[in-house]
From Swiss-Prot:
GO molecular function, one term: structural constituent of ribosome
GO CC aspect terms: cytosolic large ribosomal subunit; cytosolic ribosome; peroxisome
InterPro entries assigned: eL8/uL1-like, Ribosomal_uL1, Ribosomal_uL1-like, Ribosomal_uL1/biogenesis, Ribosomal_uL1_3-a/b-sand, Ribosomal_uL1_CS
Claim: Signal is one of the keywords in the record: no
One protein family per Pfam: Ribosomal_L1
Gene3D superfamilies cross-referenced by the UniProt entry: 3.30.190.20, 3.40.50.790
Quaternary structure note: Interacts with the GTPase NUG2.
Name of the protein: Large ribosomal subunit protein uL1y
Gene: RPL10AB
Similarity field: Belongs to the universal ribosomal protein uL1 family.
Organism, as annotated: Arabidopsis thaliana
Keyword Transmembrane helix: no
Alphabetical keyword list: Ribonucleoprotein, Ribosomal protein
Length: 216
């Protein structure tokens, strides 16, 4: 049972949109769900991690890189998608600094089957440590569909602190779309928690430049 009041969410979204209208920015602001947890010990309790695909893409400009075989690299080129082949990965020479820099340059990675198997050998644990191990793409599925699916997927991962922020939308979306994304994100997050809603201390929605609005 969700304890999230639809009214509170709708009000917060309307306020956020209204405030952003007052001061136009020259970029599209992201809307972030900020989460505070309670009765959770990151040292003892299981640190959860989970991903959910939202109905609407929160960050259309999300940077994705295809680590591909020849065919996937060619497809990525045609789509204007950043890509690297095995030779380019070999050049990083497992250098921790370079792998870290690569991980920081993109929000997510996709990889062909033949490449994904070689990643630990070619790059070491760097991408995994950054929580950005590539998603497998086979030749049977459309690369474009996979890119859109990746853009629509958000990840909740508890690290050492009891608060986190996840991008769940942007201000170019309609209020209804934002509402659907927020609702789905919150319900998914709560399902990951040991005691569900009893572990939620507070929830806020915030646009990049705006003040946070409490929704729970």
């Amino acid at each position: 049972m969700s304890k999230l009041q639809s009214e509170a969410v709708r009000e917060a979204i309307t306020t956020i949109k209204g405030k952003s209208e007052e001061k136009k920015r020259n970029f599209v602001e992201t809307v972030e769900l900020q989460i505070g947890l309670k009765n959770y010990d990151p040292q003892k309790d299981k640190r959860f991690s989970g991903s959910v695909k939202l109905p609407h893409i929160p960050r259309p400009k999300m940077k994705i890189c295809m680590l591909g075989d020849a065919q996937h690299v060619e497809e990525a080129e045609k789509m204007g998608l950043s890509n690297m082949d095995v030779e380019a990965l070999k050049k990083l020479n497992k250098n921790k600094k370079l792998v870290k820099k690569l991980a920081k340059s993109y929000h997510a990675f996709l990889a062909s089957e033949s490449v994904i198997k070689q990643i630990p050998r070619l790059l070491g644990p760097g991408l995994n440590k950054a929580g950005k191990f590539p998603t497998l793409v086979s030749h049977q599925e459309s690369l474009e569909a996979k890119v859109n699916e990746t853009k629509a997927t958000v990840k909740f991962q508890l690290k050492k602190v009891l608060c986190m922020g996840v991008a769940v939308g942007n201000l170019s979306m309609e209020e209804k779309q934002l509402f659907q994304n927020v609702q789905m994100s919150v319900n998914f997050l709560v399902s990951l928690l040991k005691k569900n809603w009893q572990n939620v201390r507070c929830l806020y929605l915030k646009s990049t430049m705006g003040p946070p609005q409490r929704i729970f």
